[in-house]
Amino acid sequence: MEVGNEIVIQNGTQWSFGNGVAQHFDEHVRQSIPLYDEGHDLVCHLSDFFIRDYSLCYELGSATGNLIGKSYQRHKSKKEVRFIGIEEIPEMNQVAQSKFSELEFITSSVEEARLEPSDLIISYYFLQFILPDKRIKILSKIYESLVEGGAFILFEKEIMTDPKVNKLIVSNYIKFKQEHGFSPEEILSKQLSLEGVMINHTHAENKEMLKSAGFHHVETIKMRHIKILIFLI
């Protein structure tokens, strides 16, 4: 079944970031997710508070490297800064490395990757693809790797607690995808393929999970009432 941008998923199978998705990923996400690039800009602006000379920044689930690459371009004039993307899909890292040859991309799951002491760790629409029973362990690992004064930025799609509001947001999301060229069949196919793969939480559930992992200072930034950025120090 087709989900748009020449991405085809076999009937009855779940969504995967492998199997040729990397070649079409950039176009697909920009046409699928409202304010995708604006979210990158917001993360980069926030990074100014944490990236200094000799800093280390990770992006978890770095895909084709656009966000970690943009962050690096913003701070590359600083002394010996390091920006590392962690992505378990080899094809994604191949695309990322071809665009940003000066950066390091590690092909590994976050669970298996070794995190060095770091000033900033970014998760941009990544944690929602991790099974819920594994998230606390990953968040604890992130917390333990941050240096004093460091930060974790979590950018996630969340479920609204009010069913009426949730319905409005879902409806607007579908309209956004239609306006960007996706057919109703492609939208439905993508939605069905994501069942059991992308598992979203409410805002309260995410905050509680983060606090359980050790984060004590949790703040939220709302982006035009569409995206939620959870900002942790």
Predicted regions and their residues:
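N-terminal, positively charged/glycine-rich alpha-helical extensions of SAM-dependent methyltransferases
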Residues: 1-24
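Conserved alpha-helix/loop element of class I SAM-dependent methyltransferases that forms part
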Residues: 37-53
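Class I SAM-dependent methyltransferase SAM/SAH-binding core
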Residues: 58, 63-112
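A conserved beta-strand element that flanks and buttresses the S-adenosyl-L-methionine
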Residues: 122
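A short glycine-rich, Lys/Arg-flanked "PGG" loop and its adjoining helix->strand segment in the class I
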Residues: 136-148
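Conserved beta-strand signature within the Rossmann-like core of class I S-adenosyl-L-methionine
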Residues: 149-157
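C-terminal alpha-helical "lid/dimerization" subdomain adjacent to the S-adenosyl-L-methionine
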Residues: 158-209
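Core SAM-dependent methyltransferase catalytic element
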Residues: 213-233
